[in-house]
């Protein structure tokens, strides 16, 4: 069982733009595997990042989690016209599959 503090440490790595992208992706995939509200919250915080590739993977991973609690996050991303088309497209695909 992973503690709340461990989830927070993983989440901090994900949202830290000073971390190498490889470490941030590892954190994302770890959170995806853990699932739950804490993981969804940390993943949702990362949508303000500058990396389009990371944000695309955030949406993809939220969809892979198959957790209805992620739907409002994905809808917000889809409706956010400041998000890149590739990111919004992935959020739309995930929502259609739900």
Q: What annotation goes with each model-predicted range?
A:
Residues 52-63:
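Generic detector of contiguous secondary-structure segments
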Residues 14-20, 47-53, 80-86:
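Short coil turns that connect the paired helices of HEAT/ARM alpha-solenoid repeats
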Residues 88-98:
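Short, intrinsically disordered, charge-balanced linker/junction segments flanking boundaries
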Residues 32, 63, 96-97:
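Structural signature of alpha-helical solenoid repeat scaffolds
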Residues 12, 17-34:
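Alpha-helical segment of the N-proximal tetratricopeptide repeat
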Residues 2-15, 36-48, 67-79:
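Amphipathic alpha-helical scaffolding segments comprising HEAT/armadillo-like alpha-solenoid repeats
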């Amino acid at each position: 069982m992973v503690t709340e503090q461990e989830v927070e440490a993983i989440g901090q790595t994900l949202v830290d733009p000073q971390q190498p992208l490889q470490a941030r992706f590892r954190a994302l995939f770890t959170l995806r595997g853990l699932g739950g509200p804490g993981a969804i919250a940390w993943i949702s915080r990362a949508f303000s990042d500058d990396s389009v590739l990371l944000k695309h993977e955030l949406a993809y991973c939220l969809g892979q989690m198959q957790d209805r609690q992620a739907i409002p996050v994905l809808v917000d991303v889809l409706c956010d016209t400041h998000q890149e088309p590739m990111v919004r497209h992935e959020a739309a695909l995930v929502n259609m599959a739900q």
